[in-house]
Amino acid sequence: MIKKIKTSILTLLNVIAHPLEKLWSDEKDIKYLDIFPPVFIIGSPRSGTTVLYQLLCKHLQFGYINNFVSNWPKAPVTATKLYERFSKNSNPIDLKSEFGNSSYMSGPSEFGEFWYRWFERSHRFKFDNNNIKKLRIEISGLTKIHQRPLIFKNVVHSMRILSLRKIFRESLFIVLERKKLDIAQSILNARIYLYNDKNHPFSVVSSQDQLDPKISYERAIISQINSIYSNIDLAEDTLGKDKFIFVSYKDLCENTEKILKNIQNELEKRNQNIPFNKNKVPDKLKYSTGQKVSDEDYKLLKNEIKKYDRIK
């Protein structure tokens, strides 16, 4: 009940605040997108994208959208200016999260409602009303405030790559990869935890199998994962390998500092110079792998993966 009231109040306040964005909108600011092109973290849900996002926001000098600003999807530039001006929140970014949501108002956000202003639920960009130009102006306004490249993490962007690259011509994509069976188990556990229903869709819809009630949950989950990475592969073939940086979740956990430095080096090769902050990078993180579901579910998911690999 309290959450619904909060949402209703924020929705009303966003409508009121939206006209203020025009005060800061300047087409000349689009030049900042060439100076500081955005970087997008993509991959399957439950692949480790959130912890990579937190690590990069904490240890490299990226700009990012925090949880406070995320509450203002229709007035993000105004909200960022207010936050920069008045916030005394100095909570450090921690590496805790719950299904993509980080802690504190200062924590990195997926910024989901903002992106749905510009994209359909089918992942198609809303091309009407000169939206490409409007979105570029809005993101460039945020970039101007931060004076550094913005990094965004939202797994739905895995299905929007070509549109994002068309809008942000110099943008780059960091792809998280993890063992498929580990991802599948984590998605299944998320379905059970959030909905108490193994068949309830979770996170990005990348395949119609996810929405077909006649299809088994193990097939729907594996189809979801496969469709996401197939779309990333297609985008890589279309745009070129140099637009993508691939990161192994296992390597990230077992050699955290080394992988962050590798990412920094790869960005530098692509003309993105992102210095490290002075805080200490952890040597490694807990690597979660192995069986996390019942024997029956584990067998079903494993067999479904093998079935796909045989077809492939």
Where in this protein do the model-derived segments appear?
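ATP-binding Walker
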Residues: 47
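Conserved phosphate-donor/acceptor-positioning beta-strand/loop module used by diverse small-molecule
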Residues: 153-155, 164-189
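PAPS-dependent sulfation machinery
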Residues: 68-151
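PAPS-dependent sulfotransferases, especially Golgi type II membrane carbohydrate sulfotransferases
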Residues: 1-32, 188-312
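A conserved segment at the C-terminal end of the G1
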Residues: 50-63
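The Walker A (P-loop) glycine that initiates the GxxxxGKT/S ATP-binding motif of P-loop NTPases
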Residues: 42-43, 153
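Pre-Walker A (Motif I) flank of P-loop NTPase domains
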Residues: 36-38
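Short catalytic-loop micro-motif centered on adjacent basic/acidic residues
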Residues: 149-153, 246-248
